[in-house]
């Protein structure tokens, strides 16, 4: 999983791809209209692929609806990602400050950890000795 | 003679020959170079492994081939015809010919002086018809101007270096709003594009260009935000590490404490017995005061032989705690009474 910033960038790229796909869908599957009653729609030639692949109105409507929904969903994802970007309230100085503090705390904690490990080892040795002497008995 | 032979073979062979300086890698040269490196390292007080390159080698010797070449002096070089720079920096939008929408991020010192100029170039470029097929390929045209106009390193390092060098106290709280505005504008512009295309397809290119500008701006803002995000992530990582370390310390202490309590409990019960055993040897000596019951027809308090001593030992290890001690005492009392009865009968 990548960080949120990369996720956001990918989401934006996907939004762009969806734009293109949506545009292509409408461009490809719309129906043809006449400007005046006298106009006629020329039948497409048999040896050429048709310019538009008109879908039945209800199918076309449904497709449009689905694509629009997808767009809105993607947009919502993007906005969610934007609002969850980390550390928008921190300035650079705040960040550097907290990094320094964390570093010191880490040093202290590491020392404490080593002490605890040493202590544990000592107790372990004692326990081991005791157990050994009992077993021998 | 040898040179001409080399040239001939280089022309004739299908694969190119290795570079000519491979002959410089003789054992004596390697030895000499290692010595120079060692000397250089000791002079500058750094470990030998950290010496990448010894400057000021005699230029006429073969030794210069034994180390990587120096960095380019002006910080730029070309790779596959593309100019590369030592300073990896984000190119400002304006210099890529893209109109900047909204305020620049805090920390980036990009000025908007060239704004009017870029807008004119932008509108000029939009006179070309832009179909949706060319859209994805033209979405990142920034490479084109860069390859034509390699910027001097001093000017490219300025915007990128400013954000890391001088730390700003401004926050990024306006970024939310800006990004949300941009994404909303994207949707709206796409809707407008569809509307325009349904009425007058020839006029759609302007809208497509707008969309392009919006997308580029979005990406640019995100890239400007990257250093900030990297620092943020570092903070998160350190916090996690800190928590982990503390948890480990606590767990270690808890275990040590528990073990010590067990030891103390054992010590109050067992340790005298352990000492007795250590003195008396491993159960073969019959002198221990507490072991003593079994087949020998002797009253209980009197010590008995070793055969029964081991069984007593086993039994004693099996139980522990104060309860065991009491049980032990009762056992001895019962046993003693039994032997007492026997003694009476015999007498």
From Swiss-Prot, chain A:
Q: Name one GO biological process term.
A: regulation of transcription by RNA polymerase II
Name of this chain's protein: Mediator of RNA polymerase II transcription subunit 21
Q: Which family does it belong to?
A: Belongs to the Mediator complex subunit 21 family.
Single GO cellular component term: mediator complex
Q: Which Pfam families match?
A: Med21
Q: Which UniProt keywords apply?
A: Activator, Coiled coil, Nucleus, Transcription, Transcription regulation
Q: Does the keyword Transcription apply?
A: yes
Keyword Nucleus applies? yes
Q: Which GO terms describe its molecular function?
A: transcription coregulator activity
The record lists the organism as Neurospora crassa (strain ATCC 24698 / 74-OR23-1A / CBS 708.71 / DSM 1257 / FGSC 987)
Q: Which residues form a coiled coil?
A: 87-130
Q: What does this protein do?
A: Component of the Mediator complex, a coactivator involved in the regulated transcription of nearly all RNA polymerase II-dependent genes. Mediator functions as a bridge to convey information from gene-specific regulatory proteins to the basal RNA polymerase II transcription machinery. Mediator is recruited to promoters by direct interactions with regulatory proteins and serves as a scaffold for the assembly of a functional preinitiation complex with RNA polymerase II and the general transcription factors.
Q: Which domain of life is it from?
A: Eukaryota
According to the UniProt record, where is the region Disordered? 37-56
- What binding partners and quaternary form does the record give? Component of the Mediator complex.
From Swiss-Prot, chain B:
Tell me the function of this protein. Answer: Component of the Mediator complex, a coactivator involved in the regulated transcription of nearly all RNA polymerase II-dependent genes. Mediator functions as a bridge to convey information from gene-specific regulatory proteins to the basal RNA polymerase II transcription machinery. Mediator is recruited to promoters by direct interactions with regulatory proteins and serves as a scaffold for the assembly of a functional preinitiation complex with RNA polymerase II and the general transcription factors.
Keyword Nucleus in annotation? yes
Q: Which GO terms describe its cellular component?
A: core mediator complex; mediator complex
Report biased composition (Low complexity) as residue ranges.
108-171, 302-312
Q: Where is this region: Disordered?
A: 97-172, 302-326
Q: Where is this gene product found?
A: Nucleus
Q: How does it assemble?
A: Component of the Mediator complex.
What are the alphabetically sorted keywords of the record?
Activator, Nucleus, Transcription, Transcription regulation
Which organism was this protein described from? Answer: Neurospora crassa (strain ATCC 24698 / 74-OR23-1A / CBS 708.71 / DSM 1257 / FGSC 987)
Superkingdom of origin organism = Eukaryota
Q: What is this protein called?
A: Mediator of RNA polymerase II transcription subunit 7
